[in-house]
Amino acid sequence: MSPPQHVAGVCGSLRDASYTRIALDHALQAAEDCGAPTTLVDLRGYDLPVFDTDHREAGDAARLQEDIQRADSVLLGSPMYHGSYAAPLKNALDYCGFDEFENTTVGLLAVAGGSFPTMTLEHLRSVCRALNAWVLPHQAAIPTASEKFENG
């Protein structure tokens, strides 16, 4: 039997009481319950200046890349902002590339304060495909998140 797949959940929200982080914690706990080791890549803990191609190794870029490369599968989580995914996640993905995502299985999770976050998921799917990742056909979406979570 093959060893369990290591799953990294990348939280694209910087908010302290983030519904995205809560949802990722639940998803990662479910993976752990199935025997998979997990890592939460919480972007609040990384120094990632706005991406500049002249400074690809700025801040904690190397640590972010290593944390994602170490995983067999990646779950990207983002709140919906103006119909798309959050800038911190976009910035983190800009520091990554084929080395981190090519042939990696990627799951998508989006959280919205209002309507269904369809566009967020579609945008993330397009970015992951451009990185040659294997994006799961099923995705997780949580509309009206404040009504779904009570005390975590």
Where do the language-model regions lie?
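A generic structural signal for short beta-strands and their flanking turns/coil linkers
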Residues: C34, E102-T104, H138-A140
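Helix-loop-strand module that forms the ligand-binding subsite of alpha/beta enzymes
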Residues: G59-W134
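Acidic, glycine-rich active-site loops and adjacent beta-strand->loop/helix elements
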Residues: Y46, A110-S115, T144-E147
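Hydrophobic/aromatic beta-strand patches that form the interior of the parallel beta-sheet core
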Residues: V10, G107-L109, L136, A140
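Glycine-rich NAD(P)-binding loop of Rossmann-like domains
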Residues: H6, E102-N103, N151-G152
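Short clusters of hydrophobic/aromatic residues that line enzyme substrate/ligand-binding pockets
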Residues: L48-F51, F101, I142, F149
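Glycine-rich phosphate/pyrophosphate-binding loop and the adjoining helix
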Residues: S2-P3, R63, V135-G152
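N-terminal beta1-alpha1-beta2 submodule of the flavodoxin-like/Rossmannoid cofactor-binding fold
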Residues: M1-N91
